């Protein structure tokens, strides 16, 4: 008697932001290489996951909500999508649920799934920043997450200390992209030319750009008034171009606006220094070897909350990974033209600040190494192992 073929392994993935969509797509690609036609994907994702064959439950743009007031206004819709997504997981009964970033949404789904079907293994790809604030989340996650895939090398130890679920460092996706971040010989000459390229990165969301662009422009104006010569480039994405152009209209010095990811990377490869809003971009700049000054401004309510919640000495991701505060940060009321301009002058010249950053950035390859395996491969290995093991 012939035995029937093994049923397909079903994996349910949830990614509600573009960065998570890219991670999900890379993970799906490796899982398909491992399982061939024996895998079926369901879930929520964006355009890149769709290219790997995912039919999303709803467009992720429905959750592109920024700002406290907007979130409150859209709360009934958000809660409905959480319920509907959890119901879809429970109906599918997958061999694994992989939640990717966006913890305010994905963790609520995971908790509902675990409460109603504890047999479904749950993997969390991208740790919440519990090492920075609300550390108690680690123990809470123990109740509904079986394994965390960390992007940062210090995260497994943080989970161990905080009593959270098992966490493995799989590597940041940026380490798979070093070739596009680092200059060739000709680009290195441009990076070291007499007229240095200064990058300005005011944020990747409209609200972030509006919080930073005016003060950044004023700081650059001061720098120019002091006689400092530089070429200014401002990388952004197509959907943010109008916001950027509106913001720089009153700038005393006009930047060249660079549109798109490939063009941004080309600008990174020739840049001498940067002024950036704190975020993932600081790690991108550091891996590219670009000394920087960082700033961070938010609304008054958010600032009030963050001041009482933050438990790390620096909010700069690159500083946290390096383990040393080499990059200056100007937060909230310290984010002023008067303070930013002198710091920018230092990173544009051969100063101690600039040299310290360059030396620290040279250590990142070793600090962030994942051996000879790509992050997406390591992530897929753990998802498959968790599926085989089932619920602990």
Curated annotation (Swiss-Prot):
This is Lipid-A-disaccharide synthase. GO terms for cellular component: membrane. It catalyses: a lipid X + a UDP-2-N,3-O-bis[(3R)-3-hydroxyacyl]-alpha-D-glucosamine = a lipid A disaccharide + UDP + H(+). Keywords: Glycosyltransferase, Lipid A biosynthesis, Lipid biosynthesis, Lipid metabolism, Transferase. Pfam families: LpxB. GO terms for molecular function: lipid-A-disaccharide synthase activity; phospholipid binding. It comes from Bradyrhizobium diazoefficiens (strain JCM 10833 / BCRC 13528 / IAM 13628 / NBRC 14792 / USDA 110). NCBIfam families: lpxB (TIGR00215). Belongs to the LpxB family. The keyword Glycosyltransferase applies. The lineage of its organism: Bacteria, Pseudomonadati, Pseudomonadota, Alphaproteobacteria, Hyphomicrobiales. Condensation of UDP-2,3-diacylglucosamine and 2,3-diacylglucosamine-1-phosphate to form lipid A disaccharide, a precursor of lipid A, a phosphorylated glycolipid that anchors the lipopolysaccharide to the outer membrane of the cell. Its EC number is 2.4.1.182. Pathway: Bacterial outer membrane biogenesis; LPS lipid A biosynthesis. One of its GO terms (biological process) is lipid A biosynthetic process.
